Amino acid sequence: MKVLIVALALLALAASAASSTSGGCGCQTPPFHLPPPFYMPPPFYLPPQQQPQPWQYPTQPPQLSPCQQFGSCGVGSVGSPFLGQCVEFLRHQCSPAATPYGSPQCQALQQQCCHQIRQVEPLHRYQATYGVVLQSFLQQQPQGELAALMAAQVAQQLTAMCGLQLQQPGPCPCNAAAGGVYY
């Protein structure tokens, strides 16, 4: 019996020690679980958009294809500022076969035309020259396929007179309904 009293006393002592560390009320408080930490990325900083200053714009104009420069692959380019002197050269019938070819006016127009052809990118010279020649032919005497064949020959002669070689690229991505010409 003494053993039982000693055991109960030890239990009471252990219980009182536990109650003094757990808040003093004699009961244990349930453990408080914090939610897992929430990860928040650091704030993302975007610098303010700056408009380019006028002096920062490129000074070179974008390179245009002959379709963009001359419209419909050169057809309809009679008013084109790029080969306007060639139009005049053809309009005055200044060609090796024509009699006024040796006139001073034809020689001046030829020089100006050659200068303008040299300004066209080499890959696009044939398309540009052909388009101007064809348009000139069609305005004078619309002959369809025959005019197209003659225009090809004259375009080659014209560039040869200027001392230039032609590079004949593939067809221009224009359609015939828009007045385009397939070579």
Swiss-Prot record:
Claim: Methyltransferase is one of the keywords in the record: no
The compartments listed are: Vacuole, Aleurone grain
Signal peptide boundaries: 1-19
In terms of Pfam families, this protein maps to:
Gliadin (PF13016)
Give the record's keywords alphabetically.
Repeat, Seed storage protein, Signal, Storage protein, Vacuole
Where's it mainly located? other
Q: Name one GO cellular component term.
A: vacuole
Gene3D superfamilies from the xrefs? Plant lipid-transfer and hydrophobic proteins
GO molecular function: any one? Answer: nutrient reservoir activity
Entry's InterPro entries? Bifun_inhib/LTP/seed_sf, Bifunc_inhib/LTP/seed_store, Glia_glutenin, Glutelin
Its function, per the record, reads: Zeins are major seed storage proteins.
Instruction: State how it assembles.
Output: Interacts with OP10 (via N-terminus).
Matching entries from PANTHER family are given as: GLUTELIN-2, PROLAMIN PPROL 14P
- Entry protein name: 16 kDa gamma-zein
